[in-house]
């Protein structure tokens, strides 16, 4: 049990408590998370590590230690992974007697220091059934209520704000529910509380161990002010597989938009976290205010139009489906997708249910006189589309909101490697070799290499764009033997990354066009002469009559031959030879 004295940061203590309890329930040990880090950076928000949210701000009006907050806002904030760090890293600014000590300035560089991340957060209105469900799921629930010590029974540590005292809910505090007792007697509460039935929640307060029963209290199920239930699933940073968090929604407003059945929202990102290395997307994070929300999720890679989230290649043969039973912040594990550095990808989320979803968005918002948000919304970030088959994507900027869609990736140890092209080479006696290959998806172009068959180094002879799948190598020596290969490459952030290659078979360039140097009649026939070519294996002799077609009349297997006597030529007939 911690002590928030002398500050009004009960909300940060509530969030820390449910995160710590989640880690403890996972057998991760006892964590002491920093409430000061959360409350300070919530109201002094910094740009995220990927640089996508420079103008997203939360403004707490007045002293952030005294203004207050709530854990629904805190959960949205922590979905950006701005904490939580440890108490040792950013300690609570009081001395041993709980007198404030604000002389130590927290460095901005610690904004994203974290020992644990928020994975999921469930948010709900109050009911006994829902409270128990959330406790069974996450082991602790932060709640809002009105806490006044005069309504505490000092003998039993039982508390209940007087039932029927007010027609409206009043709130001044946040505590953490850690259990329940259906048999806890109504007689343990003060008569002024007007409790009429048994049953109590076991709550952990943040007023120190000297208050209540070692810092714990019994709270009647009937307390009229119990409100805003928030539970959390935390993950230790050391256990987080995907360490890159892509998002545009840095501020923490509770704004939502209606997404009807069949309608979609999407976010488009450029892959930059890997700094030249490929990344793998494995999680999607979103926010909704609706229970039992049903989604279909599709990832599109290599977008050709940054303003069309579906202009790339669909990663899944069929969209990945997911149901979120309780409203809140949800991280969804999806089948992994490899992303090339510098490429654009999208996360498209479609309402696959029959009911409307209240989907979380970032927007400029104000909450009374204590809290405001600004949203640095840019074009090309997030989009929405109606359910019509002919519908087109509309930029969220036109409505002044950004959808709360985050993508979690991990960085590979190497750049993305394109597939090896399947290719073939043919020699043509017009003086060139033709290299052709099959298309490789997701690439920018192809390199063609050549080297002598007898050995030597590869030489790049062509850089071919994706519009062509062949190259004519005219700089060959007749009858010379070569090897070829083709590499696919992609371009990202001004750099090119090529794939592996397979060495082709030896191919011999076709001989040069053979010219006949003379044709003369001799006693026994007609003599055809030519100048022999180097490295030639032989010659084909063709003949035709005037107006006819060439016919093969002889195959000569000696490459050094320079003449042939056509003994079958008829006297008085004109012939043409090649």
What are these regions (language model features)?
Residues 473-494, 566-578:
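Beta-strand-rich modules
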């Amino acid at each position: 049990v911690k002590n928030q004295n002398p500050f009004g940061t009960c909300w940060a203590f509530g969030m820390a408590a449910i995160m710590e309890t989640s880690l403890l329930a996972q057998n991760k040990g006892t964590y002491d998370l920093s409430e000061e880090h959360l409350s300070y950076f919530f109201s002094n928000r910094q740009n995220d590590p990927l640089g996508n949210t420079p103008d997203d701000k939360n403004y707490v009006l007045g002293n952030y230690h005294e203004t207050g907050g709530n854990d629904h806002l805190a959960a949205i904030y922590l979905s950006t992974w701005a904490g939580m760090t440890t108490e040792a890293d950013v300690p609570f600014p009081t001395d041993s007697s709980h007198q404030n000590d604000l002389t130590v300035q927290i460095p901005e560089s610690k904004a994203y220091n974290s020992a644990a991340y928020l994975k999921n957060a469930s948010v709900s209105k109050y009911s006994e059934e829902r409270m128990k469900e959330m406790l069974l799921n996450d082991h602790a629930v932060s709640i809002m209520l009105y806490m006044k010590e005069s309504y505490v029974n000092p003998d039993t540590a039982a508390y209940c704000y007087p039932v029927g005292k007010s027609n409206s809910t009043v709130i001044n505090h946040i505590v953490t529910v850690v259990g329940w007792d259906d048999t806890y007697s109504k007689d343990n509460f003060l008569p002024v509380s007007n409790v009429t039935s048994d049953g109590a929640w076991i709550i952990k307060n943040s007023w120190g161990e000297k208050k209540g029963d070692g810092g714990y209290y019994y709270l009647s199920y009937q307390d009229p002010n119990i409100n805003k239930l928030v539970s959390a699933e935390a993950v230790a940073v050391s256990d987080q597989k995907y360490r890159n968090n892509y998002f545009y929604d840095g501020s923490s407003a509770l704004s939502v938009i209606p997404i009807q059945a069949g309608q979609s929202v999407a976010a488009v990102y450029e892959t930059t976290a890997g700094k030249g290395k490929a990344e793998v997307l494995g999680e999607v994070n979103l926010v909704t205010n609706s229970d039992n929300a049903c989604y279909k999720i599709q990832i599109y890679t290599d977008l050709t139009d940054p303003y069309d989230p579906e202009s790339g290649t669909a990663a899944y043969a069929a969209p990945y489906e997911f149901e979120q039973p309780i409203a809140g912040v949800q991280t969804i594990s999806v089948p992994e997708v490899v992303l090339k550095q510098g490429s654009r990808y999208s996360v498209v989320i479609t309402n696959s249910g029959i009911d409307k979803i209240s989907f979380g968005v970032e927007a400029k918002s104000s909450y009374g006189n204590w809290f405001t948000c600004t949203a640095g919304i840019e074009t090309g970030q997030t989009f929405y589309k109606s359910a019509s088959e002919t519908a087109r994507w509309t930029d969220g900027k036109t409505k002044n909101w950004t959808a709360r869609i985050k993508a979690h990736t991990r960085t590979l140890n190497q750049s993305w490697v394109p597939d090896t092209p399947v290719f073939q080479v043919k020699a043509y006696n017009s003086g060139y070799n033709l290299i052709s290959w099959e298309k490789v998806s997701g690439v920018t172009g192809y390199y063609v290499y050549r080297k002598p068959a007898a050995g030597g180094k590869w030489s790049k002879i062509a850089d071919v764009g994706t519009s062509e799948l062949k190259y004519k190598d005219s700089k060959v020596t007749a009858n010379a033997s070569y090897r070829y290969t083709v590499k696919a490459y992609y371009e990202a952030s001004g750099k090119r990354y090529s794939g592996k290659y397979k060495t082709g078979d030896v191919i011999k360039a076709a001989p040069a066009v053979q010219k006949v140097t003379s044709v003369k009649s001799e006693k026994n026939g007609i003599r055809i002469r030519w100048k022999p070519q180097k490295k030639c294996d032989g010659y084909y002799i063709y003949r035709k009559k005037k107006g006819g077609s060439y016919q093969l009349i002889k195959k000569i297997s000696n490459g050094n031959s320079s003449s042939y006597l056509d003994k079958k030529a008829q006297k008085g007939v004109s012939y043409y030879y090649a």
